[in-house]
């Protein structure tokens, strides 16, 4: 069949909207009509050419929602008409990682997914002249139709709006999940969030759900203060506005001191920036003896993090998280329910709705800092 897609032909170049060929689903695969897709910083990272694993030509996009059109042989959990959210972190429920219950990082299709291919080592997309087009993160939601493995699709309720729940495919789950699944924040905790973009706001939302008492947002853009407060932030710090000689670490330690606890420091911190210097600050502002710092942001290729070993010897912990520690097929439907039940907010984060032909405007809005999340609808 033919479908419409925004194709990344080369790094650093705008996406080109065109008709492409799409083959039918094979064994264990599903054809999806994508109804809406978010534009994420990860898509931008690859499109820019900074991603060492970036492949071209490719159909990017990994934050979508749509409807099952056709199932290949052997598919048991889905049928035509089902509403689904694509998962860049699948859940096969059979590999050692899934069975361990210690991680959400399913390894069933990781090797081929990283090569921009389907599990059988081939691609379903091609140019009209037959040139193969790579898949992206196993999803390729910048196409009106895509083919994905059954294990990488979460079935969700039919009454949830596609242009909102697509955000659950990455940003919402990554932020909220980092709080609830990875850090396991408890009622009354003091927490700090570095970087108040889409992920950071969802971390704040997760902290509010968890019952954190003190939620400190850190950003160099004062405009983010209003956004943070909307989702539950209680305090705001702009490192550029601190008195001369006062570091952001010292400011946070001082803010979290009490008459009972004169040491100070956050119980939890979350880095949503991908900046390795900020990651160090995020660790070192946590409390001696038990502070946990969760790394969410993706750093540039080759970047390394550092701190004095004494910071770790004295009880602080560095943790990483991917997709918020969520097991996609199990957890994503629950998060959709939370949204539909009014337990989490998504609507106000979708700041721009665009047709596919204007997808490059969504990237421009991201670069200019004018959007939280732009969504393309088909």
Describe the function of each predicted region.
Residues 193-196, 208-281, 302:
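Adenosine-nucleotide cofactor-binding segment
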Residues 297-315, 333:
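Rossmann-fold NAD(P)-binding glycine/threonine-rich loop
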Residues 1, 259, 280-284, 325, ...:
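C-terminal hydrophobic helical "lid"/dimerization subdomain
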């Amino acid at each position: 069949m033919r479908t419409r897609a925004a194709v990344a032909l080369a790094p650093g170049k705008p996406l080109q909207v065109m008709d492409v060929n799409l083959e039918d689903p094979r064994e264990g695969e599903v054809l999806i009509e994508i109804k809406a897709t978010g534009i994420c910083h990860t898509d931008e990272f690859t499109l820019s050419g900074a991603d060492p694993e970036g492949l071209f030509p490719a159909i990017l996009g990994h934050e979508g929602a749509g409807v099952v059109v056709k199932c290949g042989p052997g598919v048991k959990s889905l049928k035509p008409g089902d509403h689904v959210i694509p998962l860049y972190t699948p859940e096969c429920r059979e590999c050692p990682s899934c069975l361990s219950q210690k991680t959400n990082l399913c390894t069933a299709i990781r090797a081929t997914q990283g090569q921009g291919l389907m599990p059988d080592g081939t691609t379903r997309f091609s140019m009209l002249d037959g040139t193969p087009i790579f898949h992206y993160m196993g999803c390729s939601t910048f196409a009106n139709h895509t083919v994905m493995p059954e294990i990488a699709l979460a079935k969700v309720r039919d009454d949830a709006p596609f242009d909102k729940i697509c955000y659950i495919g990455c940003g919402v789950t990554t932020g909220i999940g980092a709080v609830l699944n990875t850090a396991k924040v408890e009622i009354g905790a003091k927490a700090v969030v570095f970087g108040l973009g889409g992920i950071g706001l969802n971390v704040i939302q997760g902290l509010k759900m968890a019952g954190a008492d003190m939620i400190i947002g850190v950003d160099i853009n004062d405009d983010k203060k209003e956004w943070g407060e909307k989702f539950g932030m209680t305090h705001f710090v702009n490192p550029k506005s601190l008195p001369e000689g006062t570091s952001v670490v010292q400011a946070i330690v001082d803010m979290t001191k009490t008459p009972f606890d004169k040491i100070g420091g956050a119980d939890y911190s979350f880095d949503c920036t991908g900046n390795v210097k900020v990651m160090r600050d995020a660790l070192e502002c946590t409390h001696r003896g038990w502070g946990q710092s969760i790394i969410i942001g993706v750093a540039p290729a080759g970047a390394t993090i550092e701190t004095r070993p004494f910071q770790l010897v004295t009880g602080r912990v560095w943790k990483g998280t991917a997709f918020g520690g969520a097991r996609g097929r199990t957890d994503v439907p629950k998060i959709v329910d939370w949204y539909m039940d009014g337990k989490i907010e998504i609507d106000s984060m979708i700041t721009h709705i665009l047709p596919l032909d204007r997808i490059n405007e969504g990237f421009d809005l991201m670069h200019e800092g004018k959007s939280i999340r732009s969504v393309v609808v088909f």
